[in-house]
UniProtKB/Swiss-Prot annotation:
Residues 51-68 have a biased composition (Acidic residues). Residues 24-41 have a biased composition (Basic and acidic residues). GO terms for cellular component: host cell cytoplasm; host cell nucleus. Belongs to the papillomaviridae E4 protein family. One of its GO terms (biological process) is symbiont-mediated arrest of host cell cycle during G2/M transition. The gene is E4. This is Protein E4. Keywords: Early protein, Host cytoplasm, Host G2/M cell cycle arrest by virus, Host nucleus, Host-virus interaction, Modulation of host cell cycle by virus, Phosphoprotein. Assembles into oligomeric complexes. Interacts with host CDK1. Interacts with host SRPK1; this interaction may favor expression of late viral transcripts. Interacts with host cytokeratin components KRT8 and KRT18. It is found in: Host cytoplasm; Host nucleus. The major E4 form is first synthesized as an E1^E4 fusion protein from spliced E1^E4 transcripts, such that the first few amino acids of the E4 protein are derived from the N terminus of E1.
């Protein structure tokens, strides 16, 4: 046996090669390190001064005006009308016809192959 990496075929081309971890990441200059510390400290100091975006101020719910009520379209009632039954019957008929065609095709294929179900 050899100590080679496993071969994944074309899938191996899609995987990114792994790099060994770096022992010591480069250090930032002192000024940038201080700046980073200062901003995190300032964020912690001033975090409780006001509402955050998540909380937001409470806004009372305003009822819609008469004009908005007039412009709002009326919801369509969902009832079993003639179109629904017509569409359902048509779809049932088409599905039944397709099922018969598929069954006939399979019977023909079985017959050609000499398979008797």
């Amino acid at each position: 046996m050899t100590d080679r990496a496993p071969h994944y075929g074309l899938l191996g081309l899609l995987q990114t090669p792994t790099q060994p971890p770096k022992d010591n990441p480069p250090k930032l200059p002192e000024k940038q390190r201080r700046r980073g510390r200062d901003t995190t400290r300032n964020r912690r100091l001033f975090a409780s001064d006001g509402p955050t975006d998540e909380e937001g101020p409470e806004v009372p719910e305003i009822p819609p005006s008469d004009e908005e009520k007039e412009n709002r379209p009326e919801p369509l009632p969902v009832v079993e009308n003639g179109w629904h039954s017509f569409l359902r019957e048509t779809l049932e008929h088409q599905l039944g016809r397709l099922q018969r065609e598929v069954n006939q095709d399979f019977e023909d294929l079985y017959r050609r192959l000499g398979i008797h179900p």
